[in-house]
Every structure is written in C-alpha cells, then in structure tokens.
C-alpha cells in the first residue's frame, strides 16, 4: 500500500503519462492542480510540460497509517475486518494508527473544492492526484457519496467532468485508450 508514502513514478507510469500528454496536447487548460506527492507531481510535469502547476497537499492520497509499505496480503492477514471495510464499506473503515478515514478524506477534498472555488471556475482545469482521492473527488462533485463504491480508476486514466450551476456531469470516466 502506498497511501501517503512519497515514491518516484515507475517506468510504466512515465510511459502512460507521456502517452496521455500526447492525447491532451491540443487541450488548452486554464489551471492545473497536482498532489504534492512525488509520483503525482512527476506525472503532472510529464503530461503538462512547461505549464504552471498548482500543488496542493489536499490532493494527497488517503493516509494509510501503519498499512503503508505493507503488501495487500500482510494487511489482509493482520487486519481482516478493516481490510474488508476499506474496500467494501469504506465509510465504516477505521484507519490504522496514523491513518485517515474516508470521512477525513472527504472533508479534506471539500476544503480543496471550496478554497480553490472549483465549482465556480470556468474553462478547463486538470487535477492530477491518486486513485482513492480522485474517486472521492468525483463522488463529491457528483453529489453522490455512494458513487465512490461503483467507480474504479486505473493509473494515469483520464476522467472528464463538466461543471455548471453547482452540478457536475461525467463526460468520460477511466479512459485508458491512450495506453
């Protein structure tokens, strides 16, 4: 589990980001946001080259506490109930020591949305972040907490939401046709 561990982007991640950059080359963006995690920042830099990027700690992946750095098998063996809740009933998940609950993540992302005035922005923005964080962000913008359990996002996938009048519409979700 990575969680909030700071790691470098893998060679596969670099390849996927470069391919996504080609796909998005003609898109004019008004703002680009990225998690401050090294792997997300490297992804954003590969995709958006010399464009200015606003880094935010609020876009970090959910903190996994003492699960970070362990394998799925280790965690499932040590904490079977919490492992189940994490994947099947995330809002009942109690984080390990130093970890973050899904409610905490939701509050953090709502703070980001409010601080950056995401809902009232016009134009095109990009957000480079992490799987669980992006799933939560999409659920918040869709105003559908239950949606979190029904979407999955692959690494370096493309999702597009259209925001208007304090509502959002999913135009594209988890597009990986660029790789």
Segment roles from a protein language model:
Residues 1-43, 97-110:
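Loop-to-helix element that buttresses phosphate recognition and phosphoryl-transfer chemistry
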Residues 17, 79, 90, 109-113, ...:
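Short amphipathic alpha-helical/adjacent loop interface patches that line ligand
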Residues 18-83:
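Phosphate-coordination/substrate-recognition cap region in phosphate-metabolizing enzymes
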Residues 49, 56, 62-74, 118-123, ...:
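Acidic, low-complexity terminal tails and accessory targeting/binding regions
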Residues 82-104:
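Short glycine/proline- and acidic residue-enriched helix-loop micro-motifs
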Residues 121-131:
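Generic beta-sheet signal
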Residues 133-139:
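Catalytic DNA-binding helix-loop module of base-excision-repair DNA glycosylases/AP lyases
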């Amino acid at each position: 589990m990575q969680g909030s561990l700071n790691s470098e982007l893998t060679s596969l991640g670099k390849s996927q980001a470069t391919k996504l950059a080609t796909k998005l080359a003609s898109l004019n963006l008004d703002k680009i946001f990225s998690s401050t995690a090294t792997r997300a920042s490297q992804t954003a830099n590969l995709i958006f080259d010399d464009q200015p990027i606003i880094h935010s700690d609020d876009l970090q992946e959910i903190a996994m506490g003492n699960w970070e750095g362990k394998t799925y098998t280790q965690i499932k063996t040590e904490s079977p109930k919490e492992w189940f809740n994490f994947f099947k009933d995330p809002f009942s998940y109690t984080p390990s020591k130093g970890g973050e609950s899904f409610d905490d993540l939701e509050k953090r992302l709502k703070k980001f949305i409010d601080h950056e005035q995401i809902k009232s922005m016009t134009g095109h923005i990009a957000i480079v972040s992490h799987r669980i964080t992006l799933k939560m962000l999409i659920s918040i913008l869709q105003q559908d907490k239950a949606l979190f359990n029904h979407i999955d996002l692959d690494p370096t996938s493309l999702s597009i939401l259209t925001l208007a009048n304090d509502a959002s519409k999913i135009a594209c979700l988890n597009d990986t046709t660029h790789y």
